[in-house]
């Protein structure tokens, strides 16, 4: 993580600048799919979210709850870009891998994918090792002996909680998201102010 600019003078500043640039692209390009290179494999967006909201409303919804952010393809893409600036994108990538894993129906595919996910994210010294306590790590290892769609539930839940309590608040407070939310608020006909959403 970028704790001090002096420690990573070039990388952190460049990543932060890239994050702001990419969030700007989200607002000005309603069809995100037209530029698939902008956020790599996490760019799925379209000008309307799955619940029918336009992009500006989608952006403003990300601050309402972590669930709304994770349910938005644009939100996931933006959050992933932000996490890359903090060198902690493995948490979201693990969560997404678990979501895809739970959709599998073949026992053979479940077992194969489960071991891949464990090797990539869970085992000690894994390439994208997520921060889990020893008990959770060993429980997950045991679950792999008879892999089911729920074998990562505990680990996924703890990773989600960590993101919600730690990374998500910083994402909302980041200058890049605050600027984007202000622009989205002014562009949205249903929003009168960039202030906190009303609950009437």
From Swiss-Prot:
GO biological process: G protein-coupled receptor signaling pathway; negative regulation of signal transduction
Keyword Cell cycle tagged: no
InterPro entries for this protein: RGS (IPR016137), RGS_sf (IPR036305), RGS_subdom1/3 (IPR024066), RGS_subdomain_2 (IPR044926)
Membrane disposition: Lipid-anchor
Modified residues (Phosphotyrosine): 168, 177
Role noted for this protein: Regulates G protein-coupled receptor signaling cascades. Inhibits signal transduction by increasing the GTPase activity of G protein alpha subunits, thereby driving them into their inactive GDP-bound form. Plays an important role in the phototransduction cascade by regulating the lifetime and effective concentration of activated transducin alpha. May regulate extra and intracellular mitogenic signals. (Microbial infection) Gets inactivated and/or degraded by porcine circovirus 2 ORF3 protein, leading to enhanced expression of IL-6 and IL-8 in infected lymphocytes. This would explain chronic inflammatory response of PCV2 infected pigs.
Location of the RGS domain: 65-181
Domain of life (superkingdom): Eukaryota
Protein name, as recorded: Regulator of G-protein signaling 16
Source organism of this protein record: Sus scrofa (Pig)
Gene that encodes it: RGS16
Keywords assigned by UniProt, alphabetized: GTPase activation, Host-virus interaction, Lipoprotein, Membrane, Palmitate, Phosphoprotein, Signal transduction inhibitor
Gene3D superfamilies given in the database record: 1.10.196.10, Regulator of G-protein Signalling 4, domain 2 (1.10.167.10)
S-palmitoyl cysteine lipid sites: 2, 12
PTM note: Palmitoylated on Cys-2 and/or Cys-12. Phosphorylated. Phosphorylation at Tyr-168 by EGFR enhances GTPase accelerating (GAP) activity toward GNAI1.
């Amino acid at each position: 993580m970028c704790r001090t600019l002096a420690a990573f003078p070039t990388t952190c500043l460049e990543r932060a600048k890239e994050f702001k640039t990419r969030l700007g692209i989200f607002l000005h390009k309603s069809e995100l799919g037209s530029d698939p290179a902008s956020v790599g494999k996490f760019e799925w967006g379209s000008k309307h979210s799955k619940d029918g909201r336009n992009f500006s409303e989608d952006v403003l919804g990300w601050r309402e709850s972590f669930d709304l952010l994770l349910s938005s393809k644009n939100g996931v893409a933006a959050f992933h870009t932000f996490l890359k600036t903090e060198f902690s994108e493995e948490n979201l990538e693990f969560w997404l891998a678990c979501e895809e894993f739970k959709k599998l129906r073949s026992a053979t595919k479940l077992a194969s994918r489960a071991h891949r996910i464990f090797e990539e994210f869970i085992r000690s010294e894994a390439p994208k090792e997520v921060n889990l306590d020893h008990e959770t790590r060993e429980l997950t290892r045991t679950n792999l002996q008879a892999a089911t769609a729920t074998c990562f539930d505990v680990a996924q839940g703890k990773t989600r909680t960590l993101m919600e309590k730690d990374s998500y608040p910083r994402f909302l407070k980041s200058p890049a998201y605050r600027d984007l939310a202000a622009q989205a608020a002014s562009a949205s006909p249903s929003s009168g102010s960039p202030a906190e959403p009303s609950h009437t």
